[in-house]
Structure formats: structure tokens, C-alpha cells
Amino acid sequence: MLHHVAAVVRSSRTALVIADMPFLSYVDVGAAATNASAFLRDAGAGAVKMEGGAEMAPIVRALIESGVPVIGHIGFTPQSALQLDRTRAQGKEPATAGQLLADALALQAAGVAAIVIELVPTELAALITQRLTIPTIGIGAGAACSGQVQVLPDLLGILSGPSPRHAGE
């Protein structure tokens, strides 16, 4: 993974390259610090992105306090989806919607620079965006987020199964 991030960094003159921390690479503060610092030091990334909510806040805070810029990721979390049985949109039920809002607030309090919100109902993504003071980046979460991302394999339809609805036709 470091090799791929380094290649992107070498090919970019001005973009902020954010390394997506692999699943299980940040299970505790020690592992997170070792792996995140490698992305920054060895690959040249400008920040790391980590999936998870309030349960990740202590690890996120420790990284940020050590100088590692972190982007959060809540809602559908693709790296852990199969392992954690979260293969669908998140936040449709009141309890999970409330938890996602709490997750976003906890990550903001921990110091993340922005939060990716993926496959969350439009109204919930709008509420989260309104409640935060940091940018939100939506993936299939409606137009109310601060910015949007489209995933190239989704747009091209090159994965098995149907393309996500938010990818368009």
C-alpha cells in the first residue's frame, strides 16, 4: 500500500494525498501510529483516512496529538463491511441515525479535519453537516454535504453486481 500512495504522491504537484488506512491497521494506538507515520514519512501522504465512529476517537485523538492529520469515515465503511456485516446503507433507523450523529461529533471533538459520510440518507447527512464545523464529503449521501466524491469503479460499472444508485447512468 505504501508503494501505491508514494506513486500517487510522486505524480501530484499540488494535491493533498490522503492515504486510506487498511482494515485492521489501526486496531490500537501503537499500530495506528506505526502505520499512519509510515504513510506520511515513507510514502509522502499529507493525511490518513480511518473508518469508524466514536469508538475510534481515542486513537484518532492520539494520532492528531502526535501530528498526524486524520480524516474520518462514517456510515457505510467498505473496508470493514463484510467483516462487520455492514453491507448496506447506514442510518435508516432512528437508533443508527443517532449513533452516526454521535460518531461524527466524537470524531470532530477528537480533531479530524473532515469526515467522509458514505451511503447515509440525505436528511441525516444534511443534519450531520449542519451540526459540524468541519467539512463533510458525501459518497451517496445526498447533495447537502460540503463536497462529493464518486468512486471510479462505481461510475464505470466494473465491479460485480449492479452499480450503486448514486453512481448514475
Which stretches of residues belong to each language-model region?
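Alpha/beta enzyme core
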Residues: 1-167
